[in-house]
């Protein structure tokens, strides 16, 4: 993609900064992967056992090849986990996070059997929307970019050409009319708001214009002297503190779906033409109700687009707005990458089938909407990429998995192996036991493990069996919890943390104990009904489940079965193969396996500590003032915003700290942990300032 030639890209090297060096199989894997990529191999597979550090290997690979990278992950949770790991390993590079910005999404649909139309309903997470804009902004302004994304990256996004065409360049000393800039911001879908200044808005104070771009947390101040830009500064929107002076900055549109007036006029004409043609077809088929429904709905949308430049569901007209021909592929995040980008597919055995399934799932719903007059046929062009379209857009690809699928193994010339763990830990021993008396045997094994302060995972085939087993174990005095599909994301994280901390000893689940579960305290994984062939007991599922016990020095897996199925045989054979390699390596190098000591901490812990510290500081401040509370939190915060941090008295800082602490807890309650962490950092800074005032005797 040669779009950003007019933009001065930041060119900085990818650099891994870590106290750890590649160990175990990592040096060999990094060297072989680098060689294959540099030799131009299109598809490369890394078969990496659980816990061998595939993420770190990927970071070191990116450092070696020095190319922008898209990392595709199967779900939002793992994407966030991986993005955080990359941010720690590559702190000086742009590591971005691109997932669906819907907290809740109900697409519009029509159920013909019951004549039920379901309106589109959604809830957008503004922080995730900012991160999506941050990803496209980074891709267009620098080369040292890693974007960790879910399959939402193959869904339609506005064209990079229009996104860049809508951009405004701010350069110190350049000639620019202030009013022209304001009109430009409005055309980029920013809203003027002089009272409530937040992301996606701008405000004007005489010759000074301030804006918070959609992809930023900081504000930009542009100071004019006549028709010349005199100063450009980056500042903190809350405190007004100037952080740095800028020579040149780019401001990108507030929406990825930006269309200039000429493009919108052309789109409206095309929509009107398509509507006329479609109405003839429906009326010719005597579908008068459908024709009337389509006429009313589309006419209303056209009026909104003419008057407001936007309408609900505007994405359904994207083929006309983009100026594409019917049936052609939509633009997506991949189009924002330069031509030489590297694709990394994490847990490829799950992610690759996901990519292939997206298009058909979307089409089956859209066909009903078109057939029954709720949408024009062009709505079917607002879609994810088809499999072959996806393949056309990607270049060299690295597939990561402990259990690579047939597709990726068929594409690659063999695979790179990463079996040895840096800690020396080996794959667990697999023991097959008869199903007769399995529950009593399981109970005995649980008691043995709990005496050693170790944890147990039990996986069953059905919800009923999981519930009954949990009740049975509770009746026998076992501290046990049941993890099922109805448990929300936050509660799931809490359950896993409580298991590690020893609040309970046994976790029972169905299909929730596979990829991405990192529990070093678990020494036993028990698989009930291991000989029942099917998705949950396929060789891939079994190997992934076995991997959950690979983080413990004394890890074991017990399979309860009356016969050994082909899937079991393959899983056991592969585990024993890896185990033999690991044992031999440890023997040859005199390595004694070390238990994995992973810190049991999360953002909720940090917030609790921060909260206690804040309370102590504020109480001390009030005691120093003879118990007086001073101004309200809101008034104090407002004074700090108006006068700036340096000029604020201590009681106003107290107000701001109280207000931010409340916002921090609100963000955590809504699972916006990144927002909570940022507010926590602001609170820390304000408390440092307040402590300095107290020690100087000004508080």
UniProtKB/Swiss-Prot annotation:
Coiled-coil regions listed in the entry: none
SUPFAM superfamilies assigned to the protein according to its UniProt record, in alphabetical order: C-terminal UvrC-binding domain of UvrB, P-loop containing nucleoside triphosphate hydrolases
Residue ranges of every copy of the Helicase C-terminal domain listed in the record: 438-604
Keyword list, A-Z: ATP-binding, Cytoplasm, DNA damage, DNA excision, DNA repair, Excision nuclease, Helicase, Hydrolase, Nucleotide-binding, SOS response
Record flagged with keyword Acyltransferase: no
UniProt cross-references to InterPro entries, sorted A to Z: Helicase/UvrB_N, Helicase_ATP-bd, Helicase_C-like, P-loop_NTPase, UVR_dom, UVR_dom_sf, UvrB, UvrB_inter
Localization annotation: Cytoplasm
Every UVR domain range: 654-689
SMART domains, A to Z: DEXDc, HELICc
GO molecular function, one term: ATP hydrolysis activity
The UniProt record lists the keyword DNA repair: yes
One BP term from GO: nucleotide-excision repair
Residues engaged in binding ATP: 48-55
Domain Helicase ATP-binding, first and last residues per copy: 35-188
Highest taxon of the lineage: Bacteria
Disulfide pattern: none
Comment field on protein domains: The beta-hairpin motif is involved in DNA binding.
Family according to the record: Belongs to the UvrB family.
Self-association state and partner proteins as the record states: Forms a heterotetramer with UvrA during the search for lesions. Interacts with UvrC in an incision complex.
NCBIfam families in the cross-refs: PRK05298.1, uvrb
Protein name: UvrABC system protein B
Annotated organism of origin: Paenarthrobacter aurescens (strain TC1)
The organism's taxonomic lineage, starting at the top: Bacteria, Bacillati, Actinomycetota, Actinomycetes, Micrococcales
């Amino acid at each position: 993609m040669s779009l950003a030639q007019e933009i001065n890209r930041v060119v900085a090297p990818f650099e891994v900064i870590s106290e750890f060096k590649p160990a175990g199989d990592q040096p060999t894997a990094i060297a072989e992967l680098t060689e294959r990529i540099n030799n131009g191999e299109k598809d490369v597979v890394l078969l990496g056992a659980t816990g061998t550090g595939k993420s770190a290997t990927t970071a070191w690979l990116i450092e070696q090849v020095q190319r922008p990278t898209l990392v595709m992950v199967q779900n939002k949770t793992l994407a966030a986990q991986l993005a955080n790991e990359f941010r720690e390993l590559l702190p000086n590079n742009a590591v971005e996070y691109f997932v669906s910005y819907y907290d809740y999404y109900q697409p519009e649909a029509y159920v013909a059997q019951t004549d039920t139309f379901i309106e589109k309903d959604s809830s957008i997470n503004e922080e995730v929307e900012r991160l999506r804009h941050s990803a496209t902004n980074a891709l267009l302004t620098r080369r040292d970019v890693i974007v960790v994304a879910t399959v939402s990256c193959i869904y339609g996004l506005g064209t990079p050409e229009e996104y860049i065409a809508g951009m405004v360049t701010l350069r110190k000393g350049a000639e620019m009319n202030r009013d022209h800039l304001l009109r430009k911001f409005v055309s980029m879908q920013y809203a003027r708001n002089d009272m409530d200044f937040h992301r996606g808005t701008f405000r004007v104070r005489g010759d000074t214009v301030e804006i918070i771009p959609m992809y930023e947390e900081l504000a930009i101040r542009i100071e004019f002297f006549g028709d010349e830009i005199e100063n450009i500064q980056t500042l903190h929107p809350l405190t007004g503190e100037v952080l740095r002076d800028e020579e040149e900055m780019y401001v990108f549109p507030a929406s990825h779906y930006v269309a200039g007036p000429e493009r919108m006029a052309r789109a409206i004409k095309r929509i009107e033409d398509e509507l006329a043609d479609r109405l003839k077809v429906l009326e010719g088929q005597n579908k008068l109700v459908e024709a009337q429904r389509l006429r009313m709905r589309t006419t209303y949308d056209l009026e909104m687009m003419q008057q407001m430049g936007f309408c609900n569901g505007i994405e359904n007209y994207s083929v006309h707005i983009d100026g594409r021909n019917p049936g052609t592929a939509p633009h997506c995040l991949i189009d924002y990458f330069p031509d030489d980008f590297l694709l990394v597919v994490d847990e490829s055995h799950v992610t690759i089938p996901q990519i292939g399934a997206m298009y058909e799932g979307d089409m089956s719903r859209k066909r009903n909407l078109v057939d029954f007059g709720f949408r024009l046929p062009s709505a079917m062009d607002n879609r994810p990429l088809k499999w072959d379209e996806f393949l056309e857009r990607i270049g060299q690809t690295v597939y990561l998995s402990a259990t690579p699928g047939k597709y990726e193994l068929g594409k690659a010339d063999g695979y790179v192996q990463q079996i040895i763990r840096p800690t020396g830990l080996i794959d667990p021993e697999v023991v097959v036991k008869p199903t007769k008396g399995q529950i009593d045997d399981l109970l005995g094994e649980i008691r043995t493990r709990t005496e050693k302060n170790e944890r147990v995972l039990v996986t069953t085939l059905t919800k009923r069996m999981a519930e009954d087993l949990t009740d049975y174990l509770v009746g026998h005095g076992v501290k046990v919890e049941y993890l099922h599909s109805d448990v929300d994301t936050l509660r799931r994280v809490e359950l896993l943390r409580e298991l590690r901390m020893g609040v309970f000893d046994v976790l029972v689940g169905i299909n929730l104990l596979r990829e991405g579960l990192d529990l070093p305290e678990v020494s036993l994984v028990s698989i009930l009904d291991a000989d029942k062939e099917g998705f949950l007991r396929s060789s891939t599922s079994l190997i992934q489940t076995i991997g959950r016990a690979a983080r413990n020095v004394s890890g074991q897996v017990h399979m309860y079965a009356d016969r050994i199925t082909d899937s079991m045989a393959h899983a056991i054979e592969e585990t024993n193969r890896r185990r033999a390699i690991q044992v031999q390596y440890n023997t040859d190098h005199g390595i004694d396996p070390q238990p994995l000591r992973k810190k049991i901490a999360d953002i909720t812990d940090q917030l609790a500590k921060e909260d206690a510290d804040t309370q102590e500081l504020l109480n001390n401040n009030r005691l120093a003032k003879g118990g007086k509370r001073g101004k309200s939190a809101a008034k104090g915060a407002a004074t700090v915003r108006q006068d700036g941090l340096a000029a604020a008295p201590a009681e106003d800082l107290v107000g701001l700290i109280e207000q931010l602490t409340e916002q921090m807890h609100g963000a955590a309650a809504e699972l916006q942990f990144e927002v909570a962490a940022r507010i926590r950092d602001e609170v820390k800074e304000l408390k440092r300032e307040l402590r300095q005032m107290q020690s100087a005797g000004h508080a």
